[in-house]
Amino acid sequence: MDPNVKLDVDTSQVRQKEAGTYPIVYIAVDASGNRATANASLTVVKSAADEETVKKLAKEVIGQIITDDMSGYDKLYAIYYWVRGNIRYQDQPNLEDWLKAAYDGLKYHQGDCYVYCMTSRALLDAAGIKNMVIDTVPLRYIHFWNLVDIGEGWYHFDTTPRASGGTFLYMNDADIQEYSRNHQNSHIYDHDRFPGVQ
């Protein structure tokens, strides 16, 4: 028996972004060139975290917390405290699918800084507030938060609760950098990637 059998899986017919059942082939080849194959199928299911669902959930929340007569700052305040008050921190391994992260925050009310940030993104988008995602220069860990612009330039908007406390609602760059220096470089970011933060 060859302990170094090479195993490949042919998934060339799988369309990962389209729900369905697809054929796959396992191919094993030993050192002598003997080859064996086995056919199987792989089922791709539609994620509940699609863009339409996330937008719907975000609009439901916005409908409960935002009114037409609110100022831009009042809308930020309502979104900030909805996220802070409705999501509980729990480590999550997924840092790639923003829709899944936003869905987890809006539906299950738990997640890490990526979930807080992407839930905020979905709510800010639903409220018509200009925003972008910002992240730290990776040191010991990576942290995600938002930048927002309600007509006065870009400001920091970080809804993730911190053990040391703090409110990061419409925070200017000087203040967040001071906080960062005093808290293990929590918000060190590449200023060339995010120019013009107030």
Feature names for model-found ranges:
Residues 2-41:
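Serine/threonine-rich, repeat-prone extracellular segments and beta-strand-based repeat modules
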